[in-house]
Amino acid sequence: MKLKIVAVVVTGLLAANVAHAAEVYNKDGNKLDLYGKVTALRYFTDDKRDDGDKTYARLGFKGETQINDQMIGFGHWEYDFKGYNDEANGSRGKNL
C-alpha cells in the first residue's frame, strides 16, 4: 500500500511542471515559435513570506527573419502569469 502512495506522489511531482513549444510559422526565412510552461508550486514553511501557493504560467514568442545571407534578425517576448494573485492585484509579469 505504501509503495502505491509513493508511486502516486512521484507521478504527481513529475507532472507539476509542464512545458510545451510549437512552431507557428516557418516560410521564406521567417520563423515564429510559441512556447509555454505551467508550474504548480506549494511551499509549506513557518516563514510567512514564502508559505503558500506559488503557481505560475509562462507564455512566450520567439521570431527570426533572414535579412540577407550574413544577417538574421530576431525577437523575443515572454510573460509570467502568477496563479496566486487575487483579482484586486492583477497579474504581474515581465517582458524581455
Swiss-Prot record:
InterPro entries on file: Gram-neg_bact_OMP, Porin_dom_sf, Porin_gammaproteobac, Porin_Gram-ve
Keywords, ordered alphabetically: Signal
UniProt key word Calcium: no
Highest rank taxon of the organism: Bacteria
Pfam families referenced in this protein's UniProt entry, alphabetically: Porin_1 (PF00267)
Gene3D superfamilies: Porin
Signal peptide: 1-21
GO cellular component, one term: cell outer membrane
GO molecular function: porin activity
GO biological process: monoatomic ion transmembrane transport
Other noteworthy facts: May be missing up to 300 C-terminal residues compared to other porins.
The name this protein goes by in its record: Protein YddL
Protein's organism: Escherichia coli (strain K12)
